[in-house]
Amino acid sequence: MTGPAIELRRMVLDDLDLVRRWLAEPEVARWFLAGSTIEDELSDLERAVNGQEPTEVLLASWGRRPVGWCQWYRCSDYPDHAVGLGARPEDVGIDYAIGEPLDRGRGVGTALVATLVAHIRRLHPGVGVVADPEASNAASRRVLERNAFVLLDERVVVSEPDGKVMAIYRRPPEAR
């Protein structure tokens, strides 16, 4: 990816219409709506934006143009999911999506995850970061591997709604 850096800002309720459009994109829906619906995802995001969930949701922009969103959470706030992942209590989990079709396959996802990890580490130095894309999501796996995440396992995660095999990655605290 060349050009400006990824910028992150807290998502606001007005951003949900844009996220709705992105969730309707087949390539986003394929991975982000597994076992869920657009309305379910938007409801979860709205609760997080309103502070009713312990997840920070961020809008990602590239050159001041929104390109996707991401979120992070302390694994200890979601203990069932943390146990399912095999995450450590002090770990932080992440999710991310590139919503704009023209921005996929150009390094934007790699830059987004790098920016998100840097954001998390500014707030919580020394934490491990975990992610669990579907095992068949080769693009997401490449993004994580390019960001020094290490594959821990591939298996069904009970707390995931659709019963698919997930690739569980962790970026250790010392990875820069």
Which ranges hold each PLM region?
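Hydrophobic alpha-helical core bundles mediating ligand binding, dimerization, or RNAP-core interactions
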Residues: 19-23, 94, 113, 120
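Acetyl-CoA-dependent GNAT
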Residues: 44-93, 97-103, 173
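Conserved GNAT acetyl-CoA-binding A-motif
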Residues: 122-132
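Conserved acetyl-CoA-binding loop-helix of GNAT-fold acetyltransferases
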Residues: 105-120, 142-146
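A short, well-structured alpha-helix characteristic of acyl/acetyltransferase catalytic modules
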Residues: 1-5, 10-46, 176
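Conserved catalytic-core motifs of GNAT/GCN5-like acyltransferases
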Residues: 71, 76-77, 132, 150-165
